[in-house]
């Protein structure tokens, strides 16, 4: 994120929304990192919010956690739906003031009362309270916008995506709806919107001047896997890989190889193995291969089914010798450099499939072995044409049968999935549906808008 912004001439400002917990209330504040120390504190608070919370509640930090790790962080208080807004509407004004005073004392000039104007219910009451609190507590105001999409015409697409996530219907009038003001406003619009509180807008325009920090590129820090025999991960990788190759040649490779000379087979495989080991060690990834090998061997030993390997990782002979994969890359003419080569910037990534019913046992093993060195990561995917049709069709209230009929008009080709627009262009029945049914036209319009929103 930071590198891409820097390349287009924009300085990144790194921040995160963190939940706070106090007085029976949980809600968000926004924190921004001024320095590398601030960035460390931000990531620590994010981790603490998950580590200290039980599964029945939202991840959140205690006020003491925030105070103890506030160095080089800037705090914005959020809107009427966030932590301080919730305290106000729950009539916990005493707790509001106590916490604000504690934060003001510790954050000093690094705290702002946030003002947001989205033309939403109860927004004005909270704003008036914040304006008065700003004067009495001498905490500066900052005008901000909660942006969910770029352009104003993306409101309906965002609303549809929200309904998909919440399993609601668009026509349900009892659900919570955001206003249509959550788009990225232009400079002139902000000047007009906050003309009565120019100091809040000025603090917004000058906010970026408080930041010169940019996270440095770092290589992953992996646990060192070695034993007394090997002294280093590199030596341990070589030892295990060579032992594994001997086992593979003896039990599998000789029986299947078209080459009948055992010495010739050994030379081909040993040359390839040494080539791969040299590349892996030169890139400091020996520990990664050993870690993956260890938990796969553990899973197999504990009767947890593991896939044979897929993706470019199946091209590694080292992986085959370490039991990470069960595919002989030389037999199938697979290329190691597709998985790892000195020109590859990012870390290698094995695609490992575990039995769905027992995969949690693998997580538990990793947590017991590496303690707080283990974390889950989030991934984002795009909806394929058929799934997008089903999801948006459902929130529009179309019947299952109708949506299913539309989905069957989308050609299924796993090798080259068609976009929705390509399917519509190829299928005349789609055009008939659009012509005869306003809801189907709405469905396709929303799908086009959601596609633009994602892109």
Q: PLM features: residue spans?
A:
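Alpha-helical scaffold/interaction cores of sigma-54-like transcription cofactors
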Residues: 1-455
């Amino acid at each position: 994120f930071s590198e891409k912004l820097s390349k287009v001439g924009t300085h990144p400002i790194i921040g995160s929304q963190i939940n706070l917990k106090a007085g029976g209330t949980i809600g968000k504040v926004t924190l921004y990192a001024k320095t590398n120390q601030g960035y460390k504190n931000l990531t620590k608070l994010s981790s603490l919010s998950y580590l200290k919370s039980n599964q029945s509640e939202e991840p959140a930090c205690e006020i003491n956690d925030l105070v103890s790790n506030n160095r080089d962080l800037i705090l914005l208080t959020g809107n009427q739906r966030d932590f301080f807004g919730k305290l106000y509407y729950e009539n916990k004004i005493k707790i509001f003031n106590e916490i604000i005073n504690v934060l003001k004392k510790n954050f000093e000039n690094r705290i702002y009362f946030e003002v947001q104007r989205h033309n939403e219910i109860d927004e004005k009451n909270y704003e008036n309270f914040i304006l008065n609190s700003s004067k009495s507590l001498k905490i500066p105001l900052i005008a901000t916008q909660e942006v969910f999409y770029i352009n104003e015409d993306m409101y309906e697409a965002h609303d549809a995506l929200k309904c998909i996530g919440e399993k609601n219907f668009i026509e349900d009038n009892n659900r919570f709806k955001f206003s249509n003001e959550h788009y990225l406003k232009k400079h002139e619009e902000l000047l007009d919107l906050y003309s009565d509180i120019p100091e809040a807008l000025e603090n917004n325009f000058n906010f970026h001047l408080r930041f010169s920090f940019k996270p440095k590129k770092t290589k992953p820090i992996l646990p060192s896997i070695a034993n007394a025999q090997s002294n280093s991960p590199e030596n341990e990788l070589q030892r295990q890989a060579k032992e594994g190759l001997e086992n593979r040649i003896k039990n599998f490779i000789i029986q299947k190889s078209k080459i009948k000379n055992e010495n010739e087979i050994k030379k081909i495989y040993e040359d390839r193995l040494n080539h791969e080991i040299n590349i892996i060690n030169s890139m400091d990834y020996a520990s990664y291969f050993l870690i993956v090998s260890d938990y796969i061997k553990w899973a197999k030993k504990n009767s947890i089914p593991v896939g044979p390997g897929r993706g470019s990782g199946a091209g590694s002979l080292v992986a085959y010798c370490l039991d990470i994969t069960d595919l002989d890359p030389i037999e199938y003419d697979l290329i190691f450099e597709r998985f790892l080569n000195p020109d590859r910037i990012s870390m290698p990534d094995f695609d490992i499939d575990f039995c769905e019913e027992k995969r949690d046992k693998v997580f538990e093993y990793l947590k017991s072995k590496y303690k707080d060195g283990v974390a889950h990561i989030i991934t984002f995917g795009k909806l394929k044409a058929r799934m997008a049709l089903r999801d948006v069709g459902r929130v529009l209230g179309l019947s299952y049968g109708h949506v299913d009929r539309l989905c069957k008009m989308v050609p299924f080709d796993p090798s080259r999935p068609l976009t929705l627009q390509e399917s519509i262009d190829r299928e005349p029945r789609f055009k008939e549906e659009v012509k005869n049914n306003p809801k189907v036209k709405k469905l396709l319009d929303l799908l086009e808008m959601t596609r633009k929103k994602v892109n």
